[in-house]
Design a protein with these regions (language model features):
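Residue-level preference for hydrophobic side chains embedded in well-ordered alpha helices
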Residues: 23, 27, 31, 52, ...
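Amphipathic alpha-helical segment used for protein-protein interaction
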Residues: 14-17, 109-142, 147-149, 153-156, ...
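A short, charge-rich alpha-helical start-of-domain segment used by transcription regulators
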Residues: 9-33
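Short amphipathic helical patch at the helix-1/turn junction of helix-turn-helix
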Residues: 24-25, 36, 144-146, 170
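Sigma70-family region 2
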Residues: 13-14, 40, 50-68, 86
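DNA-recognition helix of helix-turn-helix
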Residues: 67, 81, 126, 137, ...
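Short, small-hydrophobic-rich alpha-helical interface motif
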Residues: 12, 31, 35, 45-56, ...
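Arg/Lys-rich amphipathic alpha helix in sigma70-family domain 2
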Residues: 74-96, 119
Length: 186
């Protein structure tokens, strides 16, 4: 049986390496799922996961995240995006299309997408936008643009065709664009 988050955090605060083992046991699957989807390469995902657990070790303490899974996945996503930027710079090719690239048309210019996404105001506004969506649409948006799930995975999960998923994602991006324009972000 997996440990409770509070027990895992106590291990981190005691500087016990068991904290990493317990975190991997409880949340390693979710972390790897996100990294595999983002990096599209098993070896890169495994290497990045090591960086994620090191970052987790280095930030707890002083952080005491609740819930631990959200904190872990935020670190994983940030590490994965850094790794993807590094790998694409090394390869000098476009690589796979990262779902965030689909959002570029909804946000500012392509050159400022990363800086804009880092802005707390924009982050809060996107969260407000998501709260206005029906549950299924919100799940679809988050799975695509946070977890980087493929259209095929989502179609299987929702029981919809891939074209329906693509169409709904397009409409969601258009709604986000309209929302951000109305709120003065674009």
């Amino acid at each position: 049986m997996a440990m409770e988050d509070s027990q895992i955090l106590e291990l981190f605060y005691a500087r016990s390496e068991e904290a990493i083992r317990q975190t991997k046991e409880k949340y390693g699957g979710a972390c790897m799922h996100l990294l595999r989807n983002l990096l599209q390469n098993e070896l890169d995902a495994e290497e990045c996961a090591s960086d994620v657990y090191l970052a987790l070790w280095n930030t707890i303490p002083p952080e005491k995240p609740e819930p631990l899974l959200t904190y872990l996945l935020k670190i994983a996503r940030n590490q994965g995006l850094r790794r993807l930027t590094y790998l694409n710079a090394q390869r000098r090719d476009s690589g796979p299309v990262v779902p965030l690239e689909e959002l570029e048309s909804c946000l500012a210019s392509a050159e400022t997408v990363e800086q804009t996404l880092e802005g707390k105001l924009l982050e809060q506004e996107i969260a407000r936008f998501l709260q206005t969506l029906p549950k299924k649409d919100r799940q679809l948006f988050v799975r695509r643009y946070w977890f980087c799930d493929s259209v095929k995975e989502m179609a299987e999960s929702f029981g919809w065709s891939e074209s329906k998923i693509k169409s709904k994602l397009l409409r969601l991006r258009n709604r986000l664009h309209d929302h951000l324009t109305r709120e003065g972000f674009l």
